[in-house]
């Protein structure tokens, strides 16, 4: 499943090369936010690679490198020299991984094209041999997507393949004269540097599309924990070669047509959160929590509810020790998938403060959600900014004061069949306020 277009058909190496750098980089957004975004991208890339979905993995690795190029030119760069140097070390590792993956990605795309051409030839031959008829010709269309959610969402699909080293993407091969801070390696040949993190080429053993076949997954029992397909362990000499992991299908898209990967939300999360923050709610103080989880087979699973250190009023709340939060997330290899907060006495909506807060979450991860709990009204809602209209409105907003209106519709409720699905699954609550 291609995360760029939400389809099974892969893009070419050249196509994804041009798209890897095609994202908005707003210098008005604090550099610390972009650096955190880079960490999110890197984590996702390595999940895809570990699941043998090399095309999505290499796309994200290249976007990780592209983002580094832009971060160097951010107005706050001078204040983040150490962080940028650490980022550069990550880029070196990413480039080495790209070089190892490149031949596999190219071969997979070539195999896909050969299979597609063969199928097209068969269709033409079939149409040619058919008898003339006054009836309308048969239309070859895909089966309609099932509207009802089911674990048929999970199917084995050949990994979409790309080629990221196109002539148009050689901007990453800039010389050290263009980038005075760093000696950026060339992408045209295998790197000659020593990486801090050794990478075994056995991780990228070639996987033939012809070796893949559909496998029916075990059904998901709502009364049991989420079950993931296990990744095969293999070495260079292992037989048979590893097959691609199952992939959760895309069911929702942004207003701009970009695919949104599904987020699986524990049904008990809202109730658990209200129970944890009840003391603050009684004092008419807002409380927020961070929704953390894992990326598995092209879908996100919320596994942790983290309550960070924070300060709050009746109308606002904000974290005060982000370093501890990030340390916990990195230690457990968790992604930030959104946030949840209360409106103790108000109704369920997104205030202007909420919109600006959520903007940073959604820039970091397009699928990120905001859950608002209004206990006094016994209501709740799951929201996201409209993309691109609402997101750009908030990014460009320079209105003074915490509370101010925004023109037009800025956000929407994530309604079925949106990209959020509630399921019976375990949830771990971590309260960082407790020492």
Swiss-Prot record:
One of its GO terms (molecular function) is K63-linked polyubiquitin modification-dependent protein binding. It is an enzyme of class 3 (hydrolase). The keyword Phosphoprotein applies. Keywords: Cytoplasm, Endosome, Hydrolase, Metal-binding, Metalloprotease, Phosphoprotein, Protease, Ubl conjugation pathway, Zinc. The record marks 286 as: Indirect zinc-binding. The keyword Oxidoreductase does not apply. Binds 2 Zn(2+) ions per subunit. Its EC number is 3.4.19.-. Residues 162-185 are annotated as: Disordered. Zn(2+) 2 binds at residues 356, 397, 404, 406. Pfam families: JAB (PF01398), USP8_dimer (PF08969). Zn(2+) 1 binds at residues 341, 343, 354. Residues 162-181 have a biased composition (Low complexity). The JAMM motif is essential for the protease activity. This is AMSH-like protease sst2. It comes from Schizosaccharomyces pombe (strain 972 / ATCC 24843) (Fission yeast).
